[in-house]
Design a protein with these regions (language model features):
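N-terminal ordered "arm"
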Residues: 1-60
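Nucleic-acid-binding small beta-barrel platforms of the OB/S1 family
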Residues: 1-4, 67, 92-245
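RNA-binding basic/glycine-rich loop and surface signature characteristic of RAMP-family CRISPR effectors
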Residues: 27, 79-103
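Short, low-complexity, polar/charged sequence segments that are solvent-exposed and flexible
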Residues: 40-41, 50-53, 78-82, 96, ...
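A composition-driven signal for long, intrinsically disordered, charge-rich low-complexity tracts
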Residues: 53-56, 71-73, 207-211
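A structural detector for beta-sheet-dominated domains
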Residues: 61-63, 78, 158
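Short, Lys/Arg- and Gly-enriched loop/turn segments at beta-strand edges
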Residues: 65-77
Length: 245
């Protein structure tokens, strides 16, 4: 079945793969998926033109829903069917995100947020794995090398319920920006400080999502960020959903 959807996030996974998600015309959240190896980053483009990006309205041929709680949004699609329609005007884009806002992370997933290791919920339950919130406070942007010599991209914030989270940012645009700034000679602390100032000076929306379970903790799924940063006058939309921790 062909139908349009507005993309809310494009996120980095592994080995050149990405995760995408958004909403259809009825306000249903959808995560288009493909069998392994999944969606390659090259499919975000038609020639040299980006056609799948946050705020893009696209048409896809959807085939089989494959919900597995909490990832109830999953639905297979035909990658050859993607048709770019338009970029959403700012106010329409803002209105759509505002309509999906939840008061906090726990309210998005409708199940307790457990801790140690990190923040997580139990796999196999819950009505959704993606949602939007407006943070009460952006506390810290973290960009540094891990003990495994891999770049980390994290955000620490307080949600509307007063809970504080420090979560991984998997947003493709966010990661490209940080990587580009390093390539131009900026230091990671300077990059993090600049992003923090920009977020703290703006209205911010966060798109928050759950990772897939992984071998070390097979019964746990971890929240994080993927999506985009869109800076408008006095408004920043940071979609942070995680397809993986």
């Amino acid at each position: 079945m062909k139908k349009p959807m507005v993309i809310t996030e494009v996120t980095r996974m592994q080995e050149g793969r990405v995760c995408i998600a958004g909403y259809d015309q009825h306000g249903q959240c959808l995560r288009p998926v493909l069998p392994p190896p999944g969606i390659h980053e090259s499919t975000l483009y038609a020639g040299s033109r980006a056609i799948i990006f946050p705020s893009a309205k696209v048409e896809l041929e959807f085939t089989q829903p494959t919900p597995r709680p909490p990832h109830t949004e999953d639905i297979h699609y035909d990658p050859a069917s993607v048709r770019f329609i338009e970029r959403q005007p700012e106010e329409r884009w803002h209105k759509m995100l505002q309509a999906t806002v939840c008061p906090g992370v726990a309210a998005i997933f409708e199940q307790p947020i457990l801790t140690d290791p990190g923040h997580y919920v139990l796999d196999g339950q819950g009505p959704r794995s993606l949602g939007t919130l407006r943070p009460a406070r952006i506390i810290q942007v973290i960009h540094e090398l891990s003990s495994e010599n891999k770049w980390q991209y994290r955000l620490r914030f307080e949600d509307g319920a007063g809970a504080v989270f420090r979560l991984t940012v998997t947003d493709l645009a966010w990661r490209y920006y940080c990587d580009q700034q390093r390539a131009q000679g900026e230091t990671p602390p300077h990059i993090a400080a600049s992003l923090l100032r920009a977020l703290q000076a703006s209205d911010v929306y966060l798109r928050v999502g759950l990772a897939r379970g992984w071998q070390k903790y097979p019964s746990c799924v971890f929240p994080g960020f993927h999506g985009q940063v869109r800076a408008y006058p006095r408004r920043t939309i940071l979609s942070i959903n995680a397809c993986e921790a």
